[in-house]
Amino acid sequence: MTDVSAPQTTLRDLPLGSSAIITSVGGEGSLRQHFLDMGLIPQTCVTAVKRAPMGDPLQVRLHSYELTLRLADAEKIIVETLPCPQTTPPAATQIAAAGGIYPGGHPHEREHPGFGEGGRFHDKSAEHPLPDDAVLTFALAGNQNCGKTTLFNLLTGSTQHVGNFPGVTVDRKDGRIGQHENTLVTDLPGIYSMSPYSSEELVTREFLLGERPRGIINIVDATNIERNLYLTMQLLELDTPMVLALNMMDEVRANGGSVLVNELENQLGIPVVPISAAKSEGTEELVAHALHVARYQERPERQDFCEASEHGGAVHRCLHSIMHLIEDHAERAGMPVRFAASKLAEGDTLVADKLQLDQNEREAVEHVITQMEAERGLDRAAAIADMRFSFINRVCAATVVKPTESREHARSARIDRVLTGRFTAIPAFVGIMLAVFWLTFNVIGAFFQNVLDVAITALGSFVVGLMQAADVNVTLQSLVADGVFGGVGSVLSFLPIIVTLFFFLSLLEDSGYMARVAFVMDKLLRKIGLSGRSIVPMLIGFGCSVPAVMASRTLPSERDRKLTILLTPFMSCSAKLPIYAFLTAAFFPEHGALIMGGLYFLGIAVGVLCALVLKGTLFKGEAVPFVMELPNYRMPGAKNVRHLLWDKAKDFLQRAFTIIFLATIIIWFLQTFGTNFNVVADSSQSILANIAGVTSPLFAPMGLDDWRISTALLSGFMAKESVVSTISVLFGSTDALVAALSTLSALALLVFCLLYTPCVAAIASVKRELGGAWAACMVVAQCVVAWVCAYGIYLTGATLGFA
């Protein structure tokens, strides 16, 4: 008789709204390790929440937070449909005994003592502080989307970009802590663990291990403390002085929750400071503790998180045996021995290579780990992850009380019924983006642009009038009138449009909507070879290609990263807005929003077509798995939005009065003087006309054979805004431009400007990320694509009789 086993149930098969217990996690390599680090470990209760509108990916809830993963990856996770155990955390009883329950049911934890308790972990009489002139270096580390960059801005007075989707910080940023001269804090990319799954995690790990800061400020989201403490445990293993900033405590209290901060300190062996970075609460005490532990080099009191009696002591014995075997190697490699042991035990090959163990030592370590696997009943990676989450569960049970559902989560669920609903998500996304364009280009931005344009024109007339009254040289008058006010002034008038667009994009970003867009669009993007996470750099690309290229570092796959970088320039950056607005106002004044929206969607469509070509040629294969945490919706912070708008306005003004000003002056000079350096009466006889004559034939097939147009396009290589200033200088007036170009030629020009190569700063960013060869190929390819599309538009229009 043949024994036929019943088919296994996978997470993919779990009905929505149902819960089950994970029994095993499939996959291999860094992907499987990432699953484990995100909490998808055996014996964990998981609930299927919803699927994306296109049916994939799947949203699940575990450990009191929510993740998204594709159905193909969910199929690798075996579950058993057993009821999840319900436990009442003892912390509720402790809090009630400590402070009582206030009317209304809000638990009141003991007040957290102020600074002065920091020295209780060590006897100061046996310690020697660092010299007063020693520079105290700190690493600011934490999960993505935990308020880390907000805290960095608060500590340093900097105004780094703050957003409510994973992956805002993509490079290290340094700053001084307030008025403390000999301090330096580094804002590191947000990570979930010290396993190098993505390039940002590798950057953070290499910094912490290589540069060894004097102290670590670990910021933890108190509303999602279970998820965040997983990284905390690995940071403690680095044996570096450390303080934990328990952020968003205001939200915890507002929801009727609480944290026994003093008990949490005892459990972790480091100072814990409750703060609210958004409200600037608790940061003074945090700074005092951080300076204290760094100056006295107070190392974490606890690094051992597994009990000797837990599961027969298998993991405990394994880790301590490995520590004994590798102690000398870890010291020579400059690596904390506990960290090295736990990483070896979970199978981290990078750490194993750095330790340089000989063959006998490798075999001894492997024997210890194999024995642990047999005793524990789990593979090595799952056993270590289980050890960490078991400790976190014990700590949270003893210190944390949460409501059944926070107000933020309930609100997010209601909003998501529309914004991620099966039939409403795509229409909502299209509607939101069209509303942004309409308000920017037809209502708010257009109104303030007209006001500023009138003001600049009036100022220009006033200054020229003064120069004429003073009988200033005519050539100098031309420089001021045509070069400065005609060129730079024409660009400045578009500042309101750029600020307005960034205002709306920052609202969407801060609120948490961008993460939902990634969730909704993942299946669609996968068809062109990308991951849903690629939507984040691409959406940033609508603002500026430089940070968009940098944001691609958050992608764990080199294939996805390269493909995203090459496609990002097709997302029209804000520097091109003045070109669109200028030409649209001149040739299509009644159809501004339609033309603008059409250009943006055309850029996306061309990018999709190029992606399909690249997917089938240079970038064959599948996109990496989509594992992402969905943050709750939050009200955008007025301070963050204000800082972002000021940064963008300041950057635009700096470019206007540096690169664009210089380009305008050069263009004016070349257009005013002939080859004999005498002023020419006809600009067609100028130096510039001779130079531009070489490239003009390239644009003749689409009706753009005027040398002034090719000159403007060449100036756009320096800065896209220079196209407008150059046209303004060379044509002198909008009427002259309209007389020189047909409407169809103007449309072809718009399409070419949309698609041709980005500015030199963006090209330099691509070169830094991918190398010079890739950057050069991108420039050539985009120019070819732009020419073909522009000519196609012109040819189609001419065939239909619109020429």
Label every model-predicted segment.
Residues 110-193:
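Conserved G1/Walker A P-loop phosphate-binding module
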